[in-house]
Amino acid sequence: MQSSTQKQAGSLTIVGSGIESISQITLQSLSHIEAASKVFYCVVDPATEAYLLAKNKNCVDLYQYYDNGKPRMDTYIQMAEVMLREVRNGLDIVGVFYGHPGVFVNPSQRAIAIAKSEGYQARMLPGISAEDCLFADLGIDPCNPGCVSYEASDFLIRERPVNVSSHFILWQVGCIGVADFTFVKFNNSKFGVLLDRLEHEYGADHTVVHYIAAVLPYENPVIDKLTISQLRDTEVAKRVSGISTFYIPPKELKDPSMDIMRRLELLAADQVPDKQWHFYPTNQWAPSAPNVVPYGPIEQAAIVQLGSHTIPEQFQPIATSKAMTDILTKLALDPKMLTEYKADRRAFAQSALELTVNERDALEMGTFWALRCAMKKMPSSFMDEVDANNLPVVAVVGVAVGAVAVTVVVSLNDLTDSVN
């Protein structure tokens, strides 16, 4: 066994092909597939398989290690090992697994861990999972009101807790208690055990959305709104397959803690949240979703302000050269160029004569802030507060609507802007 501190020839990169055929392979993943010495893949549709073969002629199908009645764990160990053998031979190996390569995938995690322990460079790149597709197709946001996700058999075996006030996602509901593999439909004879647990937690009439993400680009996803009791019907249960996922909406809403909100200074001592206000859109799958209009008083007040909107003084518009854009694009999509840059950032940056001095300095420094300052037009007021590298301290805020943004809505009487 080689020491984990040694630098070995050979590397392993694990990528995901997404769920929908071809289209969900990221640019980052594709660049590694094309540059690999050899590609090992486990994908579910032949179009993606053919696409991989077109991008790299040296491909091996890992699906050959499955067999009827064969324990899936044996298959996973073998999948990992055939990739590792080639890494040990000094090759740059890419493993492609459908969906997100680290979500409900054992051989990818095993291979990465072993490769790292033996001193090889190993990395996993993110991909699009069935859960990502579910969020998009069902129109739910895991942050509101939170989300719990379990593998169905593990949920039963370890008696995992349920939070009935959050989203609940169950994976692999079509193979309850199944440890081996079959090339045909799984025998889901223990499905009733799952329904018993769900009925105990939610009641027989609670909604369950049976979901299967679309694989082909011209398909629609399977979205069946059912109840737990309806799933006990034999014909309905037959629709559930090895690629099915269940989404169970919240049974109840949870009120915010006034004490915590005041400790976080989100509310003044004399303020209380307006419990009649709900963020739009509400959860269409919930059994008792409130009727919320898209343009209530709060929304109308915000929209009125658009009429007087001006760009803030501290807004930072893009202001970069084509040369800088081209170099950063290549660093993102060309693994070999990225390796060259990481080996000697100074030499790489100084050789890029088409860049401005500021752009070369930022590329040499290599930090997010340095690049942002070189590629954005920074207001002079930002220079009032700088870091050790004489770069402005800038807060970058995304568009995520978190619990704070959703919860901290006070009474309409406290709004300073009104709708005429």
UniProtKB/Swiss-Prot annotation:
Q: What residues bind S-adenosyl-L-methionine, as annotated?
A: 98, 100, 103, 130, 172, 213, 244-245
Segments of this protein annotated with the region Methyltransferase domain: 1-251
Query: Has keyword Lipid metabolism?
Result: no
User: What is the biotechnology note for this entry, i.e. how is it used?
Assistant: Gymnopeeptides exhibit striking antiproliferative properties on various human adherent cancer cell lines including cervical (HeLa), skin epidermoid (A431), and breast (T47D, MCF7, and MDA- MB-231) cell lines. Gymnopeptide B is more potent than gymnopeptide A, while both of them are at least 2 orders of magnitude more efficient than that of the reference agent cisplatin.
Region Clasp domain, annotated ranges: 252-378
Gene Ontology MF annotations: methyltransferase activity
N-methylvaline modifications at: 394, 396, 399, 404, 406, 408, 410
Known EC number: 2.1.1.-
PTM N-methylalanine: at which residues? 400
One GO term (biological process):
methylation
N-methylglycine PTM positions read 398, 402
Q: Which InterPro entries match?
A: 4pyrrol_Mease (IPR000878), 4pyrrol_Methylase_sf (IPR035996), 4pyrrole_Mease_sub1 (IPR014777)
Pathway annotation: Mycotoxin biosynthesis
Similarity comment text for this entry? In the N-terminal section; belongs to the precorrin methyltransferase family.
Q: How does it assemble?
A: Homodimer.
Q: What name goes with this protein?
A: Methyltransferase/ribosomally synthesized cyclic peptide gymnopeptides precursor gymMA1
Organism equals: Gymnopus fusipes (Spindle toughshank)
